[in-house]
Swiss-Prot record:
This is tRNA dimethylallyltransferase. One of its GO terms (molecular function) is tRNA dimethylallyltransferase activity. Substrate binds at T4, A5, S6, G7, K8, T9. ATP binds at G2, P3, T4, A5, S6, G7, K8, T9. Its EC number is 2.5.1.75. It comes from Magnetococcus marinus (strain ATCC BAA-1437 / JCM 17883 / MC-1). GO terms for biological process: tRNA modification.
Length: 306
């Protein structure tokens, strides 16, 4: 686990050199084919060296929900257990981890007319900022997890409230209080804790490196294949900043600035979530690989004795 650019993949690959381990992707963008550079997807060489699951599962126009992820991940986990292999979930998408461990919230269905009306209001009437302010009033916990420009999640929060009379965060909390269906899991949670300024510097540097590796061309290719900017996948951090540049909304310098800013904000939200994650072991960057080895060995030895 861990925020973007913290070194999750490198740590997982190191562990795989010492344990019978296969990696289960828990990044909500790496599930999409063609979204490689911007999602920091493991290289082909890395994926050939160590078995990776749930990468390139579907196309960017096919939303991959937390429910779909939970079903697929549990199948992989059970298969790994049957073969005597350790499944290691690697990624920074908190609701994917939560879906596996706690189950999925049973949220009431929302009539399509409500969603359509909210989208119309956002586009044609009051605007996104006003809708976000309304979300802050009716569902502060959900609003705190949503970017002011995230139209999809703002509409999602308001639509559930209008349809059920209860905020989305209420239904999520209700589900978390219930025992999830599925196998009981024993989990060792690890994350690398960088000083904030060092992490932000890594994020800025990585975004620039992605551009050198062809991130802009990747986005151009996705758009040329018909994957438009309103798709949830295409609004992922980094992608939407470059789409704005390609559509003439601002210059390249501004696109880089927005991409880096959005990545830093995303990391901040990830850290906030991780700080509240029970049982998580934080590792200092110096010596993180050895510390992770020690933690995993102790974890496996503890349950081996039981």
């Amino acid at each position: 686990m861990g925020p973007t650019a913290s070194g999750k993949t490198g740590l997982a690959l190191h562990l795989a050199e010492h344990f019978p381990l296969e990696i289960v992707n828990a990044d909500s963008v790496q599930v999409y084919r063609g979204m490689d550079i911007g999602s920091a997807k493991p290289t082909l060489q890395e994926r050939q060296a160590i078995v990776h699951h749930l990468i390139d599962v579907t196309t960017p126009d096919d939303p991959f929900s937390a429910g779909r992820f939970r079903t697929a991940a549990l199948e992989v986990i059970e298969d790994c257990h049957r073969r005597g292999v350790i499944p290691a979930l690697v990624g920074g998408t908190g609701f994917y981890f939560r879906a596996v461990e706690q189950g999925i919230a049973e949220i009431p269905e929302v009539d399509a007319q409500i969603v359509a009306e909210l989208n119309r209001r956002v586009c044609d009437e009051v605007g996104l900022a006003c809708c976000y302010a309304q979300l802050q009033q009716v569902d502060p916990p959900w609003a705190a997890r949503v970017e002011p420009g995230d139209r999809q999640r703002i509409v999602r929060g308001l639509s559930v409230y209008l349809a059920s009379g209860q905020p989305l965060s209420y239904w999520q909390q209700l589900s978390c209080q219930q025992a999830p269906e599925g196998p009981a899991l024993r989990i060792c949670k690890l994350a690398i804790e960088w000083p904030r300024e060092q992490l932000y510097a890594r994020i800025n540097q990585r975004f620039e490196q992605m551009l050198k590796e062809g991130f802009m061309e990747e986005v151009q290719g996705l758009l040329s294949r018909g994957y438009h900017g309103d798709l949830p996948a295409m609004r992922a951090v980094g992608y939407r900043a470059l789409i704005g540049y390609l559509q003439g909304a601002y210059d390249l310098a501004r696109a880089v600035e927005l991409g880096q800013r959005d990545s830093r904000r995303y990391a901040k939200r990830q850290i906030t979530w991780l700080k509240a994650e029970p049982g998580l072991q934080w590792l200092a960057p110096e010596g993180a690989k050895q510390a992770a080895l020690d933690e995993v060995r102790a974890f496996l030895q503890f349950f081996k004795k039981k």
